[in-house]
A protein has these predicted regions:
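Flexible, glycine/charged-enriched surface loops at secondary-structure junctions
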Residues: 1, 46-54, 117-126
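Generic C-terminus detector
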Residues: 81-130
Length: 130
């Protein structure tokens, strides 16, 4: 994980593998981190990844599956089929759209379908899209 700050690049963690922070590429980029990783370890050509549109990823941690998420057209569910336990990542939601207002509105519609502790993260994402 790397962050661009006013003081420069802050490196939190480098992992020579796919990483949770890149799961948004499954729906928001021209090529996913998974395909890029496979290409790298099998010495295949590495096309440059291109961001298709703004994306938001929501980690699902200790959260039961809710099929109502899929009623929202921008939501892509990635469910890991793990036993749900507190603190365990069981999936993630990717939302991607070129229209940031539509993306923010979908996040707003998603809020009541998620546990209350997700609200602050959703609010933060909406602020980044504004």
């Amino acid at each position: 994980e790397c962050f661009v700050t006013a003081d420069g690049l802050l490196i939190n963690e480098l992992a020579p593998r796919v990483h949770n922070s890149g799961h948004w590429t499954q729906n928001g980029a021209s090529i996913s981190q998974f395909e890029l990783h496979l290409r790298a370890i099998t010495d295949l050509p590495l096309p440059p990844p291109v961001v298709n549109s703004p994306s938001v990823m929501i980690n699902l941690i200790g959260t039961d599956l809710n099929y109502d998420w899929l009623k929202l057209p921008l939501v892509h569910l990635h469910w890991y089929d793990k036993e749900v336990r507190p603190g365990r990542k069981v999936g993630h939601l990717n939302l991607t759209d070129s229209d940031t207002d539509r993306l923010s509105a979908t996040l707003e519609a998603l809020k009541p379908l998620l546990p209350p502790e997700y609200a602050s993260g959703v609010f933060w994402a909406q602020a980044q899209l504004a």
